[in-house]
Structures are given as structure tokens and as C-alpha cells.
Amino acid sequence: MPIGVPSVPYRLPGSSFERWIDIYNRLAMERIIFLGQEVTDGLANSIVAQLLYLDSEDSSKPIYLYINSPGGSVTAGMAIYDTMQYIKSPVITICLGLAASMGAFLLCAGSKGKRLALPHSRIMIHQPLGGTGRRQASDIEIEAKEILRIKKLLNQIMADRTGQPLEKIEKDTDRDYFMSAEEAREYGLIDQVIAERPV
């Protein structure tokens, strides 16, 4: 049975009345965005909109992006990545649970020195996935070329952001490569393992 989106009480400043709002809207008021599912076009549009809004509201304050995601669409994830790099607000990324595939890529995309993970988090990197389905050989060839182009791009960005040699990234992403939070710190995907909420 679906749980639905939890609601929490909220009192407008200067008001004596409480109203109930969904938890994600309440977190956004604290400049917290939660990526807690597969990365899809719809989710990416929502996260991009939140990033742009929070940056326009006050670009000197950090935005916290909490990640617990199995990954998902590369193009949707790249929309989030590009927006994170585009805005002026520092983006603090925090992994809790799992950051896999595009989730790990976005974790690594946070502001340098501000990429964090909770102690029991798991991080997994791998190469982009593609499917052939029932299509003509020429279409499969076009898709294969695009997947190889994306793979090269993602590997280069990850090498730049982790400090790892490109050859190591290429080797490690050839198959699913799981890491603990501490291993991800040593690898350069994150900067710190934390047990308490950052101030």
C-alpha cells in the first residue's frame, strides 16, 4: 500500500496559524533538495527548477542535495549536473543509503570540499547502459556511438572531479564498482564521511 507524501506543520512568519505542507516543500524552505528515487526527466526538471529558484533567492547560501538513488537517465542527470555547475550557490551533496550510477555521478558533482556521505552509505559507479530492443542495425549503430560518446564524457568529468587517472576511471566503470563511504572518500568521489548534520 503506498504511503504517500508525508505532511508537516508549518507556521508562516508572523502568523499564529499552522498549516500542513508536504515534507519536500518544507525541506526546500531550508534549501534542502531530496533526490530519493530513479533519475527521470520529470524528476530532473523538478530538481533543476528548485536549484534555479533557490539560487535566484540567495546565491550566497548553500543548497543541500541529499541523494539516495539507484541512478537513471543520463540525459536527465546531465541536466541536473549542468545546472549545479551553472548556478552560483555552492551545492553540498550528501549521500545516505545508496548513490549508484547517475546518483554517484551527481554526488561527485557537488562543490569541491562539500561532497559528503553518511558512514553506511554505498556508492556505485559503472558505464552508461543502453538497450537495443527490436530495431534496425543502423539505429543500433547510432545508439552505440552515442553511448560511447556519453561514456567518454562521463569518465572524463569523473576523472577531473576525483583526481583519478582517466584510465583508472575507464577500468573501474567497466563493470559495477561498489564502494563504502570511506572507500569513496579515498577514491575522490566525496570529500568527507560525516556522522552528524553539517551546520
From Swiss-Prot:
CDD domains referenced in this protein's UniProt entry, alphabetically: S14_ClpP_2
Protein name per the record: ATP-dependent Clp protease proteolytic subunit 3
Enzyme class: hydrolase
Cellular component, GO, one term: cytoplasm
Active site: 101 (nucleophile), 126
GO molecular function, one term: serine-type endopeptidase activity
Protein family membership: Belongs to the peptidase S14 family.
Record function comment: Cleaves peptides in various proteins in a process that requires ATP hydrolysis. Has a chymotrypsin-like activity. Plays a major role in the degradation of misfolded proteins.
EC number: 3.4.21.92
